[in-house]
């Protein structure tokens, strides 16, 4: 039984390999290509591509920069009331961005993957015998879960070690200043009997345990008057509150991977087109698309509290990916055939992977993490505003599917 089932997979895999290595099939696509041929104008298309590169670059850079600059100004500002209001505004903006990412995965990426892998240029078997887009998206979502877990565990352990070392050094320095309970004689830590190193270790353990207990008691308190006592939680639990930034680092990096992988395909598809009729509506649609995605990514990067150079690097790579794809597409347009089976399979697989990554990130790391948090449940006004922002973001991005 097992040998017969395993042997049935072999022809299936051979069919996939044979279909990818097949020749181009422009004749099959003739029904949809006539309009493009009538509107074909390489000079006008090249001018529009240059406009698209500039517009998409500016839109993407602006989208990713707004949350980064806003978060930095909020962090640098000294006002207490302004910080609270801008904090609520940031939560609303993040909810809007989560809706954008969710719609990108479901409405744009899955649809594009289905369109590529059901193209008439690909043989019916195996590409229409099995739902490859959904299957690859599922595998990508599961792989993202594993990477999310492993990455978060790694960053949190590293952060705890750094925190414990810093607490031990501070406590030991304080005791030395007070002339307290450390042996002065042979205290260089060479022998393991009550030297400075052992004292620092013991002090560090006690300091960390006390801070952990103190922070736990205040951060997880009940709602007071419909909202969490943020000032109290922040004042006494600051050391413990820094922990989530490790998770935000992983979230921002995985989200960038999902966005960048499909941005390359989008840019390449626009770059190889020689039809102004196709390119013209895409310029505005992709500019809005890039702005919304940049806004979502910028919010995650700012929450990760990365160093300025790391944040700039992530924002820079996001902003240039689609314009770079357009440039490469324009350069290879004379000999690249987007209807070749190999190009269609690569596009469909990458779009499916991007869909799985973005759907997982939107539902698990953006929507569930914020909408099920105590801060949200203790603030009904913030709850209502966040749901409205979430639906607005999803609807705005879904509407772009009419043009993009």
Curated annotation (Swiss-Prot):
It is found in: Cell membrane. One of its GO terms (molecular function) is zinc ion transmembrane transporter activity. Keywords: Cell membrane, Ion transport, Membrane, Signal, Transmembrane, Transmembrane helix, Transport, Zinc, Zinc transport. Residues 23-49, 108-129, 270-280, 333-343 are extracellular. It holds the Pfam family Zip. Residues 1-22 form the signal peptide. One of its GO terms (cellular component) is plasma membrane. GO terms for biological process: zinc ion transmembrane transport. It is a multi-pass membrane protein. The chain crosses the membrane at residues 50-70, 87-107, 130-150, 249-269, 281-301, 312-332, 344-364, 384-404. Its main location: membrane. Residues 71-86, 151-248, 302-311, 365-383 are cytoplasmic. PANTHER family: ZINC TRANSPORTER 10 (PTHR11040:SF216), ZINC/IRON TRANSPORTER (PTHR11040). NCBIfam families: zip. Belongs to the ZIP transporter (TC 2.A.5) family. Zinc transporter that may be involved in zinc uptake from the rhizosphere. This is Zinc transporter 10. It comes from Oryza sativa subsp. japonica (Rice). The gene is ZIP10.
